[in-house]
UniProtKB/Swiss-Prot annotation:
Enzyme Commission numbers on file: 1.4.4.2
Assembly with partners or alone: The glycine cleavage system is composed of four proteins: P, T, L and H. In this organism, the P 'protein' is a heterodimer of two subunits.
Function: The glycine cleavage system catalyzes the degradation of glycine. The P protein binds the alpha-amino group of glycine through its pyridoxal phosphate cofactor; CO(2) is released and the remaining methylamine moiety is then transferred to the lipoamide cofactor of the H protein.
Catalytic function, reaction form: N(6)-[(R)-lipoyl]-L-lysyl-[glycine-cleavage complex H protein] + glycine + H(+) = N(6)-[(R)-S(8)-aminomethyldihydrolipoyl]-L-lysyl-[glycine-cleavage complex H protein] + CO2
Pfam families per record: GcvP2_C, GDC-P
UniProt xrefs under CDD domains: GDC-P
Family of this protein: Belongs to the GcvP family. C-terminal subunit subfamily.
Stated name of the protein: Probable glycine dehydrogenase (decarboxylating) subunit 2
């Protein structure tokens, strides 16, 4: 049985002792005059912890023992594609030519960086069937917002101010309706049919002269491919709307089918999902947005261009109808470097094989777990890259909820799946193993879920009170959301008031 390391580890500020140093700056050869205006000079010393290098290393090593990441084991968060991040990505991203380049340099001195961005765009265009990309968005939701702002700008430019409605399936990512609402659209929910795909009749009834577009993930969040996608595209386009592709699940179809060939006009991708760059706490992310040719004039500025005559790359601000910037400078460049490294190492055939293995792994797990008491498999049996089980029968029969199952999995040294999403599946357990998980790891995961099923029916309190073997037990999720303590200053002030007991 797994048992996680547990250290009574203070915050690094609490370990600080005056006078301790980890690095000593060399003395200047001569006196250096620092020409900083008085009004910009600090009035008090900067409050940083003072520790030696060994103390810093020991502190973070101990913390790492109380953590879990993609290098620890299976991390099957559904619709997150938590695949292994190859270490060569980090090696290339840490190259001085990447790490030390500055965004304000003259573009004549950053030709290598611009070439990387140009080549990455070329790969993404080929993979998706789009005609132009911006690499500026910093993450998936930022990319979504960029995409819906382009839809908005397109319709306004055509004088179609009545197009105020964005259609979103009930199985969509939660950020889809949020992004649409932020862009000023009214969100219209489209229900799923008994197969877990978009209800075409409901879609036909929803489209009108007010329709701006439809935001769709394919495969969807149930892991089911929208096999009526060409008809969906026809319905939306006939109504004058645009079709938007949420690229969260692109890992399932790499090299098999392209969003552009399905009829999508706009696509956002997640380099931190599909293309193996770190995300979550290991970020930052990157959410490039691609468009068909008729929408390229609305992309954020600058774009990267290439002059064949001179052989030089350049930053192109000549985008007549641009929606403007969605992030400072040019995007998260080091993430782009990691993604391009992955693409070049994998190649076209490697990407295709990665998708095949991701789909195989999800279906292998599905077939091994289906029929287990307490877990129900809604909709179709065959999935793409992920599967959603329902723990609703277990909850009704034992009182053990999806949350309890997720917490108990931690006691086996395994990361929990996404839970309670998509909302159309009650007590959802959304599992995406990815292609970088072995058969043995899949077997261990299924066995743990089966063991938890046995415990739920024989000793439900054991599951309800889990986890038991982790460094941190159950936390108060509501309090954490209502009163986050995310800085040393906040923590210190609350502790001085006696409002925290840690």
């Amino acid at each position: 049985m797994f048992r996680q390391a547990k250290w009574d580890e203070p915050l690094i500020f609490e370990l600080s002792r005056s006078g301790r140093v980890g690095y000593t700056l060399p003395k200047p050869i001569e006196d250096v005059e620092i020409r900083v205006p008085e009004k910009l000079k600090r009035k008090s010393p900067l409050n940083l912890p003072e520790l030696s290098e060994p103390e810093v290393v020991k502190h973070y090593t101990r913390l790492s023992g109380m953590n879990y990441g993609v290098d620890s084991g299976i991390y099957p968060l559904g619709s997150c594609t938590m695949k292994y991040n190859p270490k060569i990505n980090e090696e290339i991203a840490g190259h001085p030519g990447v790490a030390y380049v500055h965004p304000y340099q003259d573009e004549r001195t950053i030709q290598g960086a611009l070439k990387i961005m140009w080549e990455l765009e070329g790969w993404l265009k080929e993979i998706t069937g789009m005609d132009r990309f911006t690499l500026q968005p910093a993450a998936g939701a930022n990319g979504e917002f960029t995409g819906v702002m382009i839809i908005r700008a397109y319709h306004l430019d055509r004088g179609e101010t009545q197009r105020t409605e964005m259609l979103v399936p009930d199985s969509a990512h939660g950020t889809n309706p949020a992004s649409a609402a932020m862009a000023g659209f009214k969100v219209i929910e489209i229900p799923s049919n008994e197969n877990g795909t978009v209800d075409l009749e409901a879609l036909e009834n929803a489209v009108s002269e007010r329709t701006a577009g439809l935001m769709l993930t394919n495969p969807n969040t149930l892991g089911i491919f929208e096999d009526e996608i060409l008809e969906i595209a026809k319905i939306v386009h006939k109504a004058g709307g645009l079709l938007y592709y949420d690229g969260a699940n692109l890992n399932a179809v790499l090299g098999k089918i392209r969003p552009g060939d399905m009829g999508f006009d706009i696509v956002h991708l997640n380099l931190h999902k599909t293309f193996s760059t770190p995300h979550g706490g290991g970020g930052p992310g990157s959410g490039p947005v691609g468009v068909k040719d008729f929408l390229k004039d609305y992309l954020p500025v600058p774009l990267v261009g290439y002059d064949e005559e001179s052989g030089r790359y350049y930053l192109d601000y000549n985008v007549p109808k641009s929606i403007g910037k969605v992030k400072e400078l040019y995007g998260n460049f080091a993430v782009m470097v990691r993604a391009l490294t992955y693409l070049k190492i994998m190649g076209r055939d490697g990407l295709k094989e990665a998708s095949e293995i991701a789909v195989l792994n999800a279906n292998y797990l599905t077939q091994k777990l289906k029929g287990t008491r307490g877990y129900e498999l809604p909709h179709k049996e065959l999935r793409k890259h992920e599967v959603v089980f329902s723990a609703e029968p277990m909850k009704k029969e034992t009182g053990v909820k999806a949350l309890d199952v997720a917490k108990r999995l931690l006691d086996f040294g395994l990361h929990a799946p996404t839970i309670y999403f998509p909302l159309i599946v009650h007590e959802a357990l959304m599992i995406e193993p990815t292609e970088t998980v072995s058969r043995e790891e899949l077997d261990a995961y299924v066995e743990a879920l089966k063991r938890i099923s046995e415990e739920a029916y024989s000793n439900p309190e054991l599951v309800k009170s889990a986890p038991h073997n982790t460094a941190v037990k159950r936390v108060d999720d509501v309090l954490a959301a209502k009163r986050p303590i995310i800085t040393w200053r906040m923590y210190r002030e609350l502790k001085e008031k006696g409002e925290v007991d840690i």
